Structure formats: C-alpha cells, structure tokens
C-alpha cells in the first residue's frame, strides 16, 4: 500500500504519501504527553514553582504551541513537525499546474505561500482543534463515573435553580448523549478523507484542511533556498527579535536530537548489556555482615551484644506498655470509653457528629461488619470487601449492629447510613455503588 500513490496514472513528486502524513501526525500527538511527563517529574522536585504550571498545562502548552507554530508557518511554510519531515503547507488550487511548477518553481511558491489570514486559519486547525478535543475527552471521562451512578446523580435542576446549575446539567447531557456521536463522526470523517487521499480521489487528507483550503506538499529546492536566504537575513540583524527567531528555529535541531536520545535510552534499558553492567555493579558492593538479635558477641558477625539485644529489649518494653494500656482500658468507666470512641471516630462535615464505624478485620477473609467469613463478596468504592447482605443493610441503615449501637445514642452519633462501614466515607449512589465480586 505504500507504493499506491506511485502507481497512479499522474505522478506528482511533490505530493507526500499518506504514510508520511500519518507519521507526522503521530509525532505531533506524542509531543504534549511527553512534555507533560517531563514537567511532572520536575514538579515532584520543585513543587513550589511548577505545581501551578502543571495544573494549567493544557492552556500554557496551547499558548507555547501557538507561538512556535506561527513562527514555523510564517518562515518555513509548515508546522513544527511537518518541517521535520520536509513538508509544507500551501493554498490549494482548483487545478494542477505541473508545467508552471517545473518552469518557474520560485514564482509558483511565492504565489501559493500562506497569507497572514491563511496562517491564522492553519493555527486554528493545528492548535485550536487538538486543544478542544483534549478538553472534551477529559470532560467526557470525568463525567463517565457520574453517569453510571444512576438517576439519583443525574436529576434535572429545579425550576428556581441558578443558571450555573442549569448550564452544568445541559453540559453533562451533551457529554453523555451528543458527544459520543460527534466523536464518532470526527474519526469517521478523518478515515474517509484518508482513504480518498490514498487512492488519489482528494487533494486533502483531513476534513479541516479541506475547510480552510490548504493542502500539504513536499518541500522543493526553491523552498530550501528561500529558507536559507531568510536565515542569512536574520543573522545580519541584531536585537531581541532576531535572538528569539534563532531560538525558535533551533527547535528543529532539538526535536531529532531528543528523539535519538529517547530511542537510545529505550535501547539501553532493554538491552542485556545494561542488565549485565547493573548486575556487576551490585556484585561489587561490599555489604556489612548482618546483626542477629539474641546472639552473643562475635556470633552475629560484627555487632556487639548490646546492639544485638537492643531490639529484643524494645519489643519487651512495647509488650509491657500494651499490657498496661489494656489494664487501664479495663479500669476506665463507660463514659471514658464513649469519650475515647468519639475522639477516634470520623466526624460528619454536615452534622458535625461522630460517625459510627467498625474496625478493619485482621484477616482479609473476614467481613468487618459481621466478623465472620465473607459470603457473597461485594466491594465498596473505598476498596474494602464485605458480605453483600451486611454492607447492603449497613448502607440502608437497617443492620442490627447499627440499630443496637444507635438505640441509646440517637442525636449524638450518625449511624453510618450511606457510608463505608470502616472508613465512614460517603458511598456515591448508595447501594447502587456496590460491586459484586464473582470468584
């Protein structure tokens, strides 16, 4: 399929193949996540300075891409990644002019080069459309869990609700019902134009380029001569503007260098040579002999008896403290136990009352509520597994353990209804938020 364009009746040497265009699009799509990953790594070291930048990454990246792409469209005639593949953009004609292109390539280039209005239209396609697509995808993914919670979390606003609630409701309706169809139409239109371009039935490989009347072509000798002349004129000028132009032009060298470094690191960490070096480095380490607690001097291989017996003494002291705490808890009154339970319990943000919870089980096979072996396992949204009847009754507030506890504490405690029995966190969707586990 790579040679299909060359098998057509009319051969156009300046028309790029579909696979060149797809490679360029893949490279352009890899830049945002790569920059985001590098920024995330740096933010972990310098969160004070870079946390706000990371939170506003999409907007700042779109602004930086707008500056870089505008410079490359004005000086190179193509986007940043298109220039890396030797491609350019030009205004599309109703008919081809092969004779004029062969006789006067410089004049044809000047006649078809992008005008200022064309540059802004292409910036809208290169920067604006991907930014809008990323935002819509993120909003759709964020709304997907809410759509699965049931009708209780998707109710329409009341008649007297503020306009923000009404707008948010209709926005969620758009993301849930309309956007999947729009997303499918987006990819289907791109696929249709790609197939039409592959079989030489269209001069555009993208519907957006068709809308703005721009097509992608291979760079000719006239384009390279024009770029060299432009760089020579920029080198003669002095000032901050020429320095900025040189820095933006130097990005074309940074991209292939970074790709080479990335591929080299990928090969290095996947090769056996790197594993052998790391293994040899680990073998050369001279580790001290271990110190075993409870052995006399010299038996541990390096530590004295005092150091060896220190962990045992600490354990014995810890056991004595635990026994003292248990004896004190047995001696305290019921009021003191109630006060300590209130201090340990989570507090509701709305009622400011302590929430009744149960301790986590020592064994993962036990249900925290009934303290027996789990039957008909069900997972809560907090990740804790219960018996399905136990957690279902707990969320509805009808479990016997809840009723017994709340018999004398009504108005002083929250029963834990609608919350996780161990953590006390609110379970979205109530019983609909439970997930049965099939083993």
UniProtKB/Swiss-Prot annotation:
Name of protein: Peroxisome assembly protein 12
Assigned keywords, A-Z: Membrane, Metal-binding, Peroxisome, Protein transport, Transmembrane, Transmembrane helix, Transport, Ubl conjugation pathway, Zinc, Zinc-finger
Subunit structure: Component of the PEX2-PEX10-PEX12 retrotranslocation channel, composed of PEX2, PEX10 and PEX12.
Localization of this protein: Peroxisome membrane
Function recorded in the entry: Component of a retrotranslocation channel required for peroxisome organization by mediating export of the PEX5 receptor from peroxisomes to the cytosol, thereby promoting PEX5 recycling. The retrotranslocation channel is composed of PEX2, PEX10 and PEX12; each subunit contributing transmembrane segments that coassemble into an open channel that specifically allows the passage of PEX5 through the peroxisomal membrane. PEX12 also regulates PEX5 recycling by activating the E3 ubiquitin-protein ligase activity of PEX10.
Domain of life: Eukaryota
Zinc finger (RING-type) residue numbers: 366-439
UniProt biased composition (Basic and acidic residues): 309-322
Any one GO biological process: protein import into peroxisome matrix, receptor recycling
Residues spanning the membrane: 18-45, 50-74, 116-149, 163-199, 254-281
GO molecular function ontology, one term from the record: ubiquitin-protein transferase activity
């Amino acid at each position: 399929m790579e040679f299909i364009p060359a098998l057509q009746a009319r051969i156009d040497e300046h028309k790029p193949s579909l696979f060149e265009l797809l490679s360029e699009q893949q490279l352009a799509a890899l830049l945002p996540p790569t920059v985001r990953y590098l920024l995330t790594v740096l933010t972990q070291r310098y969160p004070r300075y870079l946390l706000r930048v990371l939170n506003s990454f999409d907007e700042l990246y779109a602004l930086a891409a707008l500056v870089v792409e505008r410079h490359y469209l004005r000086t190179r005639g193509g986007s940043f990644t298109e220039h890396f593949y030797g491609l350019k953009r030009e205004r599309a004609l109703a008919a081809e002019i092969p004779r004029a292109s062969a006789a006067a390539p410089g004049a044809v280039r000047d006649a078809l080069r992008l005008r200022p209005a064309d540059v802004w239209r292409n910036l809208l396609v290169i920067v604006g459309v991907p930014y809008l697509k990323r935002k819509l995808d993120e909003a759709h993914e964020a709304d997907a869990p809410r759509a699965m919670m049931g009708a209780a979390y998707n109710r329409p606003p009341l008649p007297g609700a503020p306009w923000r609630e009404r707008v948010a409701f209709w926005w969620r309706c758009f993301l849930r019902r309309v956007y999947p169809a729009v997303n499918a139409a987006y990819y289907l239109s791109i696929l249709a134009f790609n197939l039409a371009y592959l079989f030489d039935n269209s001069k555009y490989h993208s519907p957006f380029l068709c809308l703005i009347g721009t097509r992608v072509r291979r760079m000719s000798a006239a384009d390279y001569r024009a770029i060299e002349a432009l760089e020579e004129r920029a080198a003669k000028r002095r000032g901050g503007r020429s320095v900025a132009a040189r820095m933006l032009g130097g990005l074309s060298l940074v991209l292939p260098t970074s790709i080479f470094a990335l591929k080299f690191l990928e090969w290095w960490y996947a090769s056996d040579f790197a594993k052998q070096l790391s293994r040899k480095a680990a073998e050369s380490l001279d580790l001290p002999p271990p110190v075993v607690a409870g052995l006399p001097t010299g038996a541990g291989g390096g530590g004295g008896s005092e150091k060896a017996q220190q962990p045992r003494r600490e354990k014995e002291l810890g056991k004595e403290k635990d026994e003292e705490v248990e004896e004190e808890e047995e001696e305290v009154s019921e009021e003191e136990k109630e006060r300590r339970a209130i201090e340990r319990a989570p507090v509701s943000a709305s009622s400011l009352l302590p929430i009744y919870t149960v301790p986590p089980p020592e064994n993962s096979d036990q249900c925290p509520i009934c303290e027996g072996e789990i039957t008909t396992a069900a997972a809560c949204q907090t990740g804790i597994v219960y018996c399905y009847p136990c957690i279902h009754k707990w969320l509805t507030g009808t479990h016997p353990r809840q009723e017994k506890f709340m018999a004398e504490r009504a108005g002083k405690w929250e029963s834990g209804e609608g919350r996780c029995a161990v953590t006390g966190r609110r379970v979205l969707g109530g019983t609909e938020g439970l997930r049965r586990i099939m083993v």
